[in-house]
Structure formats: structure tokens, C-alpha cells
Amino acid sequence: MTESVTISLDAMGGDHGPDVVAPAALAALARNPALRLILVGQAEPVRQALQRHGGQESERLWVHPASEVVAMDEPPSQALRTKKDSSMRVSIQLVKQGEADASISAGNTGALMATARYVLKTLPGIDRPAIMSTIPTKGGYAHMLDLGANVDCTAEHLFQFAVMGSVCAEAIDGVAQPRVGLLNIGEEEIKGNDQVKRACQMLTDSPLNYVGYVEGDGIFKGLADVVVCDGFVGNVALKSSEGVAGLIAHYLRAEFQRNLFTRLAGLIALPVLRSLRGRIDPRQYNGASLLGLRGIVLKSHGGADAFAFGRAIETAVLEVRKGVPRMIDQRLESLLAAKESP
């Protein structure tokens, strides 16, 4: 019998709050009989959302009250200091207390990272947690981190990100010796800033399967299973790729609607276009992991719909079953031991 997994959901976070979280939770429970979900938030609005979507509390789904909500534009320090009973914070505290195995929020990213770090603390050997997400590539998909948690990083931080990303690729995807690439402005050794060059040397000297520098266009070529960068570069790269994908979709729609012949061509190409949309649909990859914490926390996109939020739930279940924080801790410990041994 499969062991049950309990996940706490910040029901008030994101652009749509319980109107997305409630249907996503109901659908996830229908797919996974070993799953239990806690909806954390203002009790009455959450229960009303459940009823609107044909659900109610049960042995596998219940509401945990939290009186406050962190606004999407609220400064992280203010949220951490003044919103001690926020749905975001209470959801993470349930992980800390052992009542939940993981927490998911579509709320304010900065506040989520600050709160998770304050409540759960970081793993030994990890200076800063990082945000990791999955991106589509020619070969399937890859994991990329950091995506915005750490704007300025040292070489040591980048090395720690590489270890965490490698462990996740190995645990979640079952990839033996995941290929780790360092995002840079060129593949030549002379290129890059001092932090990137030092991180490159550290990775070269490590037992990780380091494949060298990866340029921006190489992210999507499937050259690496894990792409490592600082949060500033990673966030810009991710948002730029989303913008380009949106621009291409805009051009395709405009061209197919130009005249009768292009409309007919669009109808003929519809199955191909639907398949393409499914492969690059960002909803498929929703659910960014906050790695390096003493617990599992995922960030859903603020504008996610129920399908996308459901994907984040599936990722959280997988990370719980694989014991990702424990695996990161063990891998770091073994790397440090190998480094210190003569």
C-alpha cells in the first residue's frame, strides 16, 4: 500500500486565491488516493470556494484557519514581521510541525522565500536557498536555478546550487549523473565574471558531471540537465523566454487569421499546433522548488489556473516521496568529506 502524503496549500495566495486552489485540490485528490490536502486560509471564503466547485471537507481534505493574507506587492520584511497568522506562514509552519510533508503557495515570491527560510531554516552547508524550475528543451526538459531568490551570488553559492539541482534531477527524473552546465556569456574559459570562473573551477574539481559553460541559446538545446546561474540572470532568462514564446504565438495567430486560405491552413495545422502548445505550455512546468531548506516548499505561478496548480501539487508529492531535502543534505555531506580527505 502506498504511504500517504499530506500537503498544505496556501489557499489565499496568488491572483485568484481559493477559486484556483480549491478546484486544483479536488482534482488532485481524485487522481491520487494516497494524497491528503490541507487548505490554509480564511475559513469561510475557502469553504465557499470548495462548495462552488462541488467539494467539501473530508478525511483527506480539510481547512486550517489563518486570518491574514500576504499581498502580492507586500515587502517581504513587512510580511515576515507583521503577518504572523498569514495563510502563507501557517502553511509552512505545518511543515515545520510535522503536520504536512510539503507546502505550496502561489503568493508573493519574496515573502515566501523569506518566510520559508525563517520558519524552516536552511540545510547544513547551504548558505542560501534557491528557486528551481523546469524548462522545456529539445531533449525533453531541464532544471534551472536560481530564478530570482539571490540576485548576487558567490562562486560557493553557484556550486551549492549545482549540487542541489543535480540531486533533484537524479531524484525526480531518475537521471544517473545529471549533466550540469553553468550559464555564461560564452563557452570559452576566458569569458565570464570572476564568480562564474571560480564556480567553473570548483565544479570541474568536483565529482559532479559538469559539462562546462552553457550560453543563453544552449539552455533550450538540451545540452545540460541542470543549468546553474545567479537569480538575476536566471529570472531575466526565464522571463525573456516566456516573452518570446508569447510573441511567436501572437504572430502565428495573426498569420493564420490573415485571409480565408490562411484560416484553412490553420485548421489543417490545428493538431500540430495543439501538440506544440502542449509541449511548451508553461502550465505543464508550474511549481518552482525552493531548494536548500529543511523542508519542501514550492512556489506556484501567481496567475496559475487550476491545471497549473495541480502540476505543482504533483511535483510536491514526487519530492516528498523521493526525500529531496535529505538527499541534498547527504550529497553535500559526501562532497565536503571527499574535499577534506587527503
From Swiss-Prot:
Q: Where are the transmembrane segments?
A: none
Q: Where in the cell is it found?
A: Cytoplasm
**What biological-process terms (Gene Ontology) are attached?**
fatty acid biosynthetic process; phospholipid biosynthetic process
Q: Name one GO cellular component term.
A: cytoplasm
In which pathway is this protein known to take part? Answer: Lipid metabolism; phospholipid metabolism
Q: Which family does it belong to?
A: Belongs to the PlsX family.
Its EC number is 2.3.1.274
Give the superkingdom in one word: Bacteria
Q: Please give the Pfam families that the UniProt record associates with this protein.
A: FA_synthesis
Q: Which UniProt keywords apply?
A: Cytoplasm, Lipid biosynthesis, Lipid metabolism, Phospholipid biosynthesis, Phospholipid metabolism, Transferase
Q: Which species?
A: Alkalilimnicola ehrlichii (strain ATCC BAA-1101 / DSM 17681 / MLHE-1)
Q: Its quaternary structure?
A: Homodimer. Probably interacts with PlsY.
Broad class of the protein's primary localization = cytoplasm
The name under which this protein is listed is Phosphate acyltransferase
| Catalyzed reactions per annotation | a fatty acyl-[ACP] + phosphate = an acyl phosphate + holo-[ACP]
From the UniProt record, which GO molecular function terms apply? phosphate:acyl-[acyl carrier protein] acyltransferase activity
Among HAMAP family, the record links this protein to:
PlsX
Instruction: Please spell out the taxonomic lineage of the organism that makes this protein.
Output: Bacteria, Pseudomonadati, Pseudomonadota, Gammaproteobacteria, Chromatiales
